[in-house]
A protein has these predicted regions:
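Short, surface-exposed beta-strand/loop micro-motifs that present aromatic residues
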Residues: 218, 404-416
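N-terminal secretory signal peptides and thylakoid transit peptides that target proteins
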Residues: 1-20
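C-terminal region of N-terminal signal peptides and the immediate post-cleavage residues
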Residues: 23-35
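Catalytic-site neighborhoods of secreted/periplasmic enzymes
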Residues: 103-202, 396, 405, 417
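Residue-level detector of anion-binding/catalytic polar loops
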Residues: 86, 147, 414
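Glycine-rich, acidic and aromatic/proline-enriched surface loops and short helix-turn segments
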Residues: 101, 106-111, 233-237, 310
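Active-site-proximal cap/lid insertion segments
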Residues: 35-49, 56-72, 79, 88, ...
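Short Gly/Pro-enriched turn/cap motifs at secondary-structure boundaries
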Residues: 93, 130, 325-330, 398-399, ...
Length: 463
């Protein structure tokens, strides 16, 4: 058995294989386990696919049974993984939520925009949001005839300056802030935060239930054109409330209204049991959405993507990695990621291709036949040639910065700077980032550090 400090790539590829083997879209329960991804040419339908882009919030890499969770059972996400490709080396664009969403919506490093600098956006500010003239995934797809919707967490700028419906989404239902109480819908700063487009609405049911209902209703419409649905759950972000925890919500909301600060960060509450309930409810909700695709005959016309917006928080499981949300160790940025397109993309595959949020933006644009705006070049690189064209991908530099931390991955090597100290790790042998090779391989360290600095020079400086 591998020791913790030398948990191998082979072990990662095997993680969760048995879990997904038990279920599958239109496959028998005893179907074969997943196999390593093999680049092959795949015939894609001429019709532009629908795009269902689902985000969990603060979900740890090993919080799904498809990724080896021993306690949390996620049969619907396991089934989704079994129907397509499960990625072991996929990353978020940041280790916190709003910068990752900037990366997803623009296909560019979060640091190219002022709104990507707060890490994350904590309060309304006219400087912090996606500029109204900046192209987005939604606006570029609208040019290709797509209808577009975003349900759930936005977190890319507050009213009165910013809104999804001003930058490409036809409709929006959700919250503008980084986190809200699941029942009362109050945000951590004491403001009520549930909107339809730009109009405040009242619905005191469990938030995950509401967002799921909206998604199902959208899918069940009589669509004449292809569509993009960004489905941004807040689960399992704080506060720690499951569907039956209205009493917890009442207590937290009362304290919030009394003026107590930091209430919704919920540092005096939560448990592993509550967290398990939240993740399993998220899984059941995604199952409802996928069943709506099946029921309406749209499943084979729809690319379904699932990931977390960053690494796990307090009660999450990021094994075998170290670190968590807000940090650039693997546990803060490596996220569970699934891509499914039944009938087009062969299923039961597991890939160790390194990819980051902005790469998925480029991928979705290419699948939709959209062209990035020349004045706003993408930083992401499409995976379409690899996934559907049978062409191996050139090694990419994956870049992060976060509150004085630095990270860059090239192949299996990772440059990491924490507290002003440079580190170098070989992730093919040391995913826990324990064996620092900085002194043994100074030339590699210098090369990756220089690559990081070249990218950083093109970004906005922190204020």
């Amino acid at each position: 058995m591998s020791s913790p400090s030398t948990f191998s790539r082979r072990s990662l590829l095997a993680t969760g294989a048995g879990a997904v083997a038990a279920t599958g879209l239109a496959t028998p329960a005893n179907a074969a386990a997943e196999t390593p991804f093999r680049a092959r040419k795949v015939n894609r339908p001429k019709r532009k696919p629908n795009l269902l882009v689902i985000l969990g919030d603060d979900l740890g890499w090993a919080d799904l049974s498809a990724y080896g969770s021993p306690d949390i059972k996620t049969p619907h996400l396991d089934r989704l993984a079994a129907s397509g490709v499960r990625f072991t080396d996929a990353y978020s664009a940041s280790s916190v939520c709003s910068p990752t969403r900037f990366g997803l919506y623009t296909g560019r490093y979060p640091g190219r925009l002022a709104g990507g600098l707060p890490e994350p956006i904590a309060s309304p500010n006219k400087l912090h949001g996606i500029p109204l003239d900046h192209p987005t995934l939604a606006s570029l797809l609208k040019e290709q005839g797509y209808s577009t919707a975003l349900f759930g967490k936005w977190h890319c700028g507050f009213l009165p300056w910013y809104s999804p419906t001003r930058v490409g989404w036809d409709e929006f239902f959700g919250n503008f802030s980084g986190g809200i109480d699941y029942f009362s819908k109050f945000s951590h700063n004491g403001a009520y935060d549930l909107y339809e487009d730009e109009v405040e609405v009242e619905d005191l049911r469990y938030y995950t239930e509401i967002v799921t209902e909206k998604a199902v209703d959208f899918i069940e419409r009589d669509h004449q054109d292809p569509w993009l649905l960004n489905l941004n759950f807040t689960t399992p972000h704080w506060p720690w409330e499951g569907p039956d925890d209205r009493d917890v919500s009442d207590e937290l909301t009362a304290r919030l209204k009394d003026g107590e600060s930091g209430v919704l960060f919920h540092r005096d509450g939560g448990s592993l049991a509550t967290y398990k309930t939240m993740v399993e409810d998220l899984d059941q909700s995604i199952g409802q959405v996928v069943r709506a695709l099946e029921r309406t005959g749209q499943l084979r016309d729809t690319v379904v993507f699932f990931a977390s917006d960053n690494g796990g928080e307090r009660f999450s499981n990021v094994w075998p990695f170290t670190g968590a949300k807000s940090g650039l160790n693997e546990g803060g940025i490596r996220v569970p990621t699934i891509l499914s397109w039944p009938g087009t993309l062969p299923g039961r595959q597991v890939s160790d291709e390194p990819a980051v949020t902005t790469d998925w933006t480029a991928t979705f644009l290419e699948l939709a036949g959209a062209t990035p705006a020349q004045d706003y070049p993408l930083d992401g690189t499409s995976l379409v040639p690899l996934l559907f064209g049978g062409r191996p991908r050139e090694t990419q530099d994956l870049f992060w910065r976060m509150r004085g931390q630095r990270a860059l991955r090239r192949g299996s090597l990772k440059y990491l700077q924490l507290d002003g100290t440079d580190h170098l790790y070989d992730l093919s042998e040391d995913v826990r980032e324990q064996a620092d090779l900085a002194r043994k391989r100074p030339e590699d360290l210098a090369e990756l550090r220089a690559a990081w600095e070249r990218i950083d020079e093109t970004l906005l400086a922190y204020s």
